[in-house]
Amino acid sequence: MSTFFQKQQQVAALDPRLGGLMASAGLYNLKALIKAIRSCKTLADERSLIQKESASIRTAFKDEDPFARHNNIAKLLYIHMLGYPAHFGQIECLKLVATPRFTDKRLGYLGIMLLLDENTEVLTLVTNGLKNDMEHSNMYVCGLALCTFANIASEEMSRDLCNEIEKLMGSSNTYIRRKAAICAMRIVRKVPDLIDHFVDRTQQLLSDKNHGVLLCAVTLAIEICRQDDEALTVYRRAVPLLVQHLKSLVTTGYSPEHDVSGITDPFLQVKILRLLRILGKENAQASETMNDILAQVATNTEASKNVGNSILYETVLTILEIDADNGLRVMAINILGKFLSNRDNNIRYVALNTLSKVVSMDTNAVQRHRNIILDCLRDGDISIRRRALELSYALINESNVRVLTRELLSFLEVADNEFKLGMTTQICLAAEKFAPNKRWHIDTVLRVLKLAGNYVREEILSAFIRLVCHTPELQAYTVQKLFSGLHQDFSQESLTLAAVWVIGEFGDVLIQGGNFEDEELVREVQPKDVVDLLSSVLDSPYVNGLIRQFVLTSLAKLHTRLSDASQQSRIEQIIASFETSVEVEIQQRSVEFATLLKRSDIRQGVLESMPPPEIKQTVLGTVSEAKPVGSTRSDKDALLDLMGDEMPVTSGGGTGADNAPSGATQQSTHDLLADIFGGGDMGGMPSAAPAASASAAQKPKSSVNDILGLFGDGASAPAAAAQQAPTPAPAATSSYGGLDLLGGLGASSSASTPAATPASTVAKSHTVYTKHGLTITLTPTTNPARPEIVHITARFTSATSAISNINFQAAVPKTHKLQMQAISNSTVHPDSTETQPLRVMVPPGAAVRLRLRIAFQVDGHSVQDQTDWAQPSA
């Protein structure tokens, strides 16, 4: 750095004027400053140099030397680009703009754009200078002013200079017109009230022959359409003109001025396609006008280079957004399928992302590319794997559930941990929804538990247990499989929980099941083997508090299910060993179970098999990437979920017991559990009282007294009072809020009453279409626990002849979210009814609104129609 100062002194000795200038302004020019900064060895040296140079520049500004001002502003802007403060040069930039020299104006405007923003107070001083330069005879000076305006204009400046910008949009100079159009876009964004000033001007510019002006005009039109829906009507009249522009770009020969990789002006083509997409949305006439040119672009554009791919991608988005023909939509999806075979990861990503959005529109067309989508699961790019997974979930249906599930399970073995929670959830939901039979369903969930048992949500685990309880013909098979799986691996928490629960509940079935194959070996399970396995679980390094709770309950149940006295004694010893546990819940269970097992007169009734809980569809919220089960599960919620409860689900994926549920949901939950357990008060819920009272009245007095006096002495008087009360005494309390896996102390299954479940609200069917012999009705269904989700069943019937090739499409407003499944059969016969499920998520309190498009063939004629439907208010 010292060499620069030496040269500085040498120059000063040769020319006193330059020496004085350098003395006041530090280094002589920008080039010298850059070299000096680059030669600094440390950051401290650079800061010291910048500080000294900034001080010299600040001092030089006081001399009002025009030559020095230009030089100092150039150095100051470089200092600003390095991240150091340079705000003290703002006024000097205004002085440069006021000079007549073009070079000074150029540097001054550059400084204004860098040092000022729309919130700076100094900006108000710039307005007059911009107005004067916009009227300058030199188009380059005018261009500088327009460029500055487009970068920093505030709302006030936009209002002040709106008329000047509108006037310049009609200039005869193409250079000025295109810059004025960009300035108009800035005004439209800042002050939407001024849109009316530019609608007509923009429409005139859309007829311009200059590609630069046309590009800016189309960009401005896009912004106006986004800001003002009324402008859509005006610009839709220009659709034929835009189609003509696009056609000339596609069919024109080689144009050196606009050619990019053999394609004429791809930037303009993309902008026109984007504007056509906006204008054609929800407008059949405009869509019909652009169908042919879109097909031409999709067919003739070369896809060997990224330039062509960008145009094809924009074309696909346009086709999918407008009311295009079915053939055109299939072509668009096929283009996306070709993108999946591209080597460029970016192209494959956007293809997967777009297919995920359109799979509900035309599932069959996307299904054709299923193999390529599955290949993307093995891609090295994690983002592509994630998008391929999401798309694979959407493709699962009754016909391909076996194939896709097999592929997903294969990928689950090698998937990253961050994918496993979502995968286990989606695989199990697909198995629940599309399983060809219950054995395949059970095998699939068992496979999931073995592969990723630490990444299974508690809702999935409880749904699996409900399934086992409701499938008595497969209980022996399931308990044997779980016994074998747990014997091989203790590390998968959900597998351990499921196996322990099922073994405890169906231990007698396991013992009586006889021989079964285990790893190509035939084995027979003895009572000792069962107790040994559960004891090994308690001693394993993977055990936690929740597993201990499950094992203790399972052992207590096995005590009544095993006839081997030695194993019963061993179970009592294992349970008693936890009476001094430091975990309160474990200690409490151990003491209660130990006391219960000594009461031979009641333990058989207390520990008898539970009645199967009500089976229902698993309802999940947003899949969280957090730990799914065990550590994230509260003890109180575990049993509620296990018994089929539908507590509100938070976005984190856990149950909503800690979030105050609505009264209706909470009441229904307690009613359900009260019936399952044979009539407990469950916290004194009013609606459960009648059933509980009736249940209590049927029980012998001695049994009630025994239950109430189970863990205390002298309970006869309270017992009599409890028997006469309208509600029975609650079950023994635990961290489950009065509920236990025992199935209710003393509550027999015969006393259970029909479960009062949260009833779904079913609206009457609404006929939305009746033409050409085809009748379509919609039946919306909502669940009080999830009122924002509306399940709609579309039913198709034919009055006369067969109707084929039915293509039923639906669109919703931006505030709704729609999922559609495939129709049960695309051909409707007069004696049949076909269905197609829809799932709509709406904002709270909003009604469902659908725009329906129906295409079909009847008597050899193709019919295409459209109708709107709004859900009537309740």
From Swiss-Prot:
Q: Provide the topology term for how it sits in the membrane.
A: Peripheral membrane protein
- Statement: the UniProt record of this protein carries the keyword Amino-acid biosynthesis: no
Biological processes, Gene Ontology terms: cytosolic transport; endosomal transport; Golgi to vacuole transport; intracellular protein transport
Q: List the GO cellular component terms.
A: AP-1 adaptor complex; cytosol
> How does it associate, per the subunit comment?
Adaptor protein complex 1 (AP-1) is a heterotetramer composed of two large adaptins (gamma-type subunit APL4 and beta-type subunit APL2), a medium adaptin (mu-type subunit APM1) and a small adaptin (sigma-type subunit APS1). AP-1 interacts with clathrin.
Please provide the record's keywords in A-Z order.
Answer: Cytoplasmic vesicle, Golgi apparatus, Membrane, Protein transport, Transport
Q: Which InterPro entries match?
A: Adaptor_Complx_Large_Subunit, AP1_complex_gsu, ARM-like, ARM-type_fold, Clathrin/coatomer_adapt-like_N, Clathrin_a/b/g-adaptin_app_Ig, Clathrin_app_Ig-like_sf, GAE_dom
Q: Name one GO molecular function term.
A: clathrin adaptor activity
Name where it mostly resides: membrane
Q: What is this protein called?
A: AP-1 complex subunit gamma-1
Q: Which Gene3D superfamilies match?
A: 2.60.40.1230, Leucine-rich Repeat Variant
Explain the purpose of this protein: Adaptins are components of the adaptor complexes which link clathrin to receptors in coated vesicles. Clathrin-associated protein complexes are believed to interact with the cytoplasmic tails of membrane proteins, leading to their selection and concentration. The AP-1 complex interacts directly with clathrin. Required for apical growth extension.
What family is this protein classified in?
Belongs to the adaptor complexes large subunit family.
Q: What subcellular locations does the record give?
A: Cytoplasmic vesicle, Clathrin-coated vesicle membrane; Golgi apparatus
User: Which PROSITE patterns does this UniProt record tie to the protein?
Assistant: GAE
